[in-house]
Amino acid sequence: MGLFRVRGRLTGPTGRTEETELLVDTGATLLVVPETLAARLELTPRRSQPVVIAGGQRARWPVAEVRLKLDGDEVTTPCFIAPDSPALLGAVALESLFLAVDPIAKRLIPVEGFVG
């Protein structure tokens, strides 16, 4: 799938907000926030989680919650805090916003929710 970027707004628990560019990556489970950005947003890690990084490397990354606003819709979502990674828009955040990836047009498209 071709990669593309979108602009979003992240807000931490103290109200600090930043506009940022997010690389859309459905292979990432969660939203990924670089350590430096997480510090500016004053994100508070709640736990840590083992992760497998592209290339098969294993690590343990902190997990926090952040408010994400994208195209007018807003959701609180878990995020990984990564030492050396770009900001990534992962699958859980996309699903929480009821968005899917159109890989041909390289854009996000709204989808319906499903119930059992």
Protein language model annotation of sequence segments:
Residues 1-116:
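Pepsin/retropepsin-fold aspartyl endopeptidases
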